């Protein structure tokens, strides 16, 4: 990750593997990313603030807060749109609450700006 970010900031291309949000695994296919002359890179991810390197090089960091009921509804709609069964969605939601959500909530501490999302 650190090497790829440095490469982008130096104006060079990187190749990254695609991520399958349904299986939570990396695909064999890749994408090419190029930032060009820009000195801005936006890293969007639920655990981005958990990475010390990212925090150290970032001028701006944001944490998006949302009511848990709204987050659950959005989560379930997201996976329903992918034609995943309700049983699978509920299981995935439970698993994420155990292995991912605690890390995400703890990362709020590192954000320079907290944004309350109410939709």
Role assignments for model-derived ranges:
Residues 26-78:
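ATP-dependent NMP and nucleoside kinases share a basic, alpha-helical "lid"
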Residues 1-39, 94:
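ATP-dependent small-molecule kinase phosphotransfer cores
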Residues 16-18, 42, 63, 116:
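A structural signal for short, well-ordered beta-strand segments and their strand-loop junctions
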Residues 20, 47, 119:
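A broadly conserved detector of short glycine/acidic/proline-rich loop/turn motifs that flank catalytic sites
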Residues 51, 80-119:
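Small-molecule kinase domains that catalyze NTP-dependent phosphoryl transfer to phosphate-bearing small molecules
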